[in-house]
From Swiss-Prot:
Keywords: ATP-binding, Cytoplasm, Ligase, Nucleotide-binding, tRNA processing. ATP binds at S26, G27, G28, V29, D30, S31. The N-terminal region contains the highly conserved SGGXDS motif, predicted to be a P-loop motif involved in ATP binding. It catalyses: cytidine(34) in tRNA(Ile2) + L-lysine + ATP = lysidine(34) in tRNA(Ile2) + AMP + diphosphate + H(+). It is found in: Cytoplasm. Ligates lysine onto the cytidine present at position 34 of the AUA codon-specific tRNA(Ile) that contains the anticodon CAU, in an ATP-dependent manner. Cytidine is converted to lysidine, thus changing the amino acid specificity of the tRNA from methionine to isoleucine. Belongs to the tRNA(Ile)-lysidine synthase family. This is tRNA(Ile)-lysidine synthase. InterPro entries: Lysidine-tRNA-synth_C (IPR012796), Rossmann-like_a/b/a_fold (IPR014729), TilS/TtcA_N (IPR011063), tRNA_Ile_lys_synt (IPR012094), tRNA_Ile_lys_synt_N (IPR012795). Its main location: cytoplasm.
Length: 462
């Protein structure tokens, strides 16, 4: 087994001469086999091995096993690190919490030692268990390949050089090499799904097909090749199509709608992998199905799907936008417009009611902002009020003809977010005279004989 292990490791670049490599060792047959193999490799390649052990303190034998490893490393002049896991809530999310603790410890050891590689002893049976668990619990295509043989980690790489070997082969290697290893009796219990698969399901599958583990290895490789191919096709187009915004990202709808559902699925999967996954936001298959339904619904120009952590994917006419929504509701505010003065409606919006016969110095910071003007004839009933839109708002567009403000927004294809933030200016009778950026009321149009006393100036920072 050693020569096969050594040859493949050299070909795959699992190590380089004189490297420092951290080997995660639990004391079980798989990790002791890995340590034994790497000790032999180290002699040939002048490697510096560092052993990292986590004492989970879940069994009475844990302390004895840790002591054995400490003595083992001392006798062989191997650098040895050990830590103990203290968990006051032993029964809640035990596996996940222990795993997080282990890898944080391994990361610290790598940083201390300046190691380029962390090696763990995952084997082919582990791969089969992992793939079955993902299928049972539900997974998407990008995660269906199971455990990766290598990936970036901490100051270098995490490599699993035993991933092609069945556990039975490791037992045979242990018998030939006659090294000491420990059996974890908790692995024989069926409390956890992984144990039930290991003890009950895998033996039946191997009985049905003695080559089952080889089939798992082939399946995993084919899945990974397919994922890499799809990624190579999608990545250049992803970089070209996705535009960053202040709140997130957006994609031109036309770019996606001309593609097949299969392309849309993998494009969006890659998009989320690049944007949301690094933020700790995950999507399930139900959400992806809902997203594709909203995307391709020709009857609805707008639609949205809520995701974790207040993230929302929204279709809005020409764009598909991914943004994190604020949890707080919009504050209902009303401002009375004082002639000859201006007010900041927000950090990027300013409104002033300016007399035509008096100079009015604008705040210096808004001079470069985009502006809109509306003349206010003397016949306009004052005072004027500014507020956000309300349900049932109507605006007079022609004599005797009013239109719902909501319909004005729809006709102009105004996104929902812009509708909610739009400002409405009303006269003393609460008639809408202006919706800056969107609509002027017929009531605001001065007659030739009207005298203009004021102008409304609306400034926005784009």
């Amino acid at each position: 087994m050693f020569w096969q292990f050594y040859k493949r490791g050299k070909e795959q670049g699992f190590w380089q001469p004189h490297q420092t490599i951290v080997v995660a060792v639990s004391g079980g047959v798989d990790s002791m086999a890995l340590l034994t193999l790497m000790e032999q490799v180290a002699e040939k390649e002048q490697l510096q091995l560092v052993v990292a052990h986590v004492n989970h303190q879940l069994r009475e034998a844990s302390a004895q096993e840790a002591q054995y490893l400490a003595t083992y490393c001392q006798q062989r002049e191997l650098t040895y690190y050990e830590t103990r896991w203290e968990d006051p809530e032993k029964q809640r999310n035990l596996e996940a919490k222990a795993r997080t603790f282990r890898y944080e410890f391994f990361k610290e050891v790598m940083e201390i030692e300046g190691a380029a590689v962390l090696m763990t002893a995952h084997h082919l049976d582990d791969q089969a268990e992992t793939i079955l668990m993902k299928l049972i619990r539900g997974t998407n295509f990008s995660h269906s390949a199971g455990i990766k043989e290598r990936r970036p980690f901490a100051t270098g790489e995490l490599i699993r050089p035993l991933l092609i070997y069945p556990k039975e082969e490791l037992y045979q290697f242990a018998q030939r090499q006659a090294f000491v290893y420990f059996e974890d009796e908790t692995n024989q219990t069926n409390e956890y799904l992984r144990n039930r698969l290991r003890n009950q399901v895998l033996p039946l599958l191997k009985q049905e097909n003695p080559q089952f583990l080889d089939q798992i290895a082939s399946f995993s490789n084919e899945q990974r090749f397919a994922q890499e191919f799809i990624q190579e096709q999608i990545e250049p187009q992803l970089s070209e199509a996705v535009e960053p915004t202040k709140q997130g990202w957006r994609i031109p709808l036309k770019r996606l709608l001309k593609e097949t559902p299969a392309y849309q699925h993998f494009f969006l999967t890659a998009f989320f992998q690049k944007t949301l996954v690094p933020l700790g936001v995950s999507l399930n298959q139900r959400q992806m199905t809902q997203i594709l339904k909203v995307l391709n619904d020709e009857r609805q120009p707008q639609g949205s799907v809520m995701l974790e952590q207040q993230w929302q994917l929204a279709k809005s006419y020409d764009w598909l936008c991914l943004e994190q929504k604020q949890a707080a509701l919009r504050e209902e505010v009303t401002h009375l417009l004082v002639p000859g003065a201006g007010i900041y409606l927000s950090e990027t919006e300013w409104l002033g009611l300016i007399a035509t016969d008096k100079p009015f110095p604008l705040p210096e910071e808004i001079n470069q902002w985009t502006g809109q003007l509306l003349a206010i004839p003397l016949t306009t009933a004052t005072p004027l009020t500014v507020r956000h839109r309300q349900s049932g708002d109507r605006i007079t567009l022609k004599p005797g003809f009013t239109k719902k403000l909501s319909r004005v927004f729809i006709d102009q294809k105004v996104p929902n977010e812009a509708r909610e933030s739009a400002w409405v200016i009303t006269d003393e009778q609460e008639e809408i005279i202006w919706v800056p950026k969107f609509a002027n009321s017929y009531l605001s149009i001065p007659l030739e004989t009207d005298k203009i006393h004021y102008r409304l100036l609306f400034k926005t920072k784009e």
